[in-house]
């Protein structure tokens, strides 16, 4: 589907249909570059993957963005048709040139983000969970490149070399950045330094509505 300034494509089951069909579902919403970020016209894909939690088989793909969403969904069609699992998709070496894609294909990036979530490396909440106020009671950490969230504590992930000042290790922490990449990196650092209750908001500020109430 082509909309003004935005293309949309999907294949397979969406989350609701997969649950209705009896699958134990896991999903992820990933925002990543649609081509080399420095190339003129570079933008982002917003990709949602739906998988069977028990088998890791791909069930559905939905993609939004101004670029070639059809290519993303074509990969999904092939994977679903062949009954492929995430483990079979995580290392696909797809065509690359800066005008057309990223060195690690955006589809493969989304697959690896979902694998990180299923393996417990990424602890996150989906945009739907965020909209349902699942983040109530969490302290907001802003992990963007520059302060972007009113009233939130800004943390530069590159400068985190130990526990954060004024942040307890058992405090409930909701980490947000522009596209969730820096938030994931900050989460890993905080885990290393003993923080026990962190969650990343999938899709980041790119997909989720502001303002966010900080603490």
Where are these regions (language model features)?
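Rhodanese-like catalytic fold shared by cysteine-dependent sulfurtransferases
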Residues: 87-98, 102-124, 134-138, 145-174, ...
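A short, polar/charged loop-to-alpha-helix boundary motif
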Residues: 66-85
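Generic beta-strand/beta-sheet core signal
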Residues: 28-30, 143, 176
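Generic secondary-structure signature for well-ordered alpha-helical cores
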Residues: 6, 23, 81-85, 94
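Generic non-transmembrane alpha-helix signal with a bias for helix starts/N-cap capping motifs
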Residues: 11-12, 72, 183
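Generic hydrophobic alpha-helical segments
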Residues: 15, 76-80, 130, 173
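Short polybasic/polar patches that bind polyanions
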Residues: 19, 80, 191
């Amino acid at each position: 589907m082509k909309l003004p300034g935005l293309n949309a494509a999907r294949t397979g089951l969406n989350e609701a249909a997969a649950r209705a069909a009896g699958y134990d579902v896991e999903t992820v919403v990933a925002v990543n570059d649609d081509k080399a970020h420095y190339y003129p016209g570079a933008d982002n894909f917003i990709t949602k993957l739906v998988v069977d939690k028990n088998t890791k088989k791909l069930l559905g793909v939905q993609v939004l963005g101004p670029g070639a969403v059809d290519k993303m969904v074509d990969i999904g069609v092939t994977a679903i048709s062949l009954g492929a699992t995430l483990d079979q998709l995580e290392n696909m070496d797809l065509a690359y040139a800066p005008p057309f894609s990223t060195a690690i294909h955006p589809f493969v990036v989304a697959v690896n983000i979902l694998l990180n979530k299923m393996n417990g490396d990424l602890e996150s909440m989906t945009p739907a969970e965020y909209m349902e106020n699942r983040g109530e009671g969490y302290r907001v950490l802003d992990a963007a490149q520059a302060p972007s969230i009113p009233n939130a504590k800004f943390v530069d992930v590159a400068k985190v070399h130990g526990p954060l000042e004024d942040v307890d290790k058992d405090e409930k922490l909701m980490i947000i950045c522009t596209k969730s990449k820096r938030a994931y990196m900050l989460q890993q650092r905080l885990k290393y330094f003993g923080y026990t209750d962190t969650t990343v908001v999938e899709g980041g500020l790119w997909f989720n509505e502001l303002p966010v109430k900080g603490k």
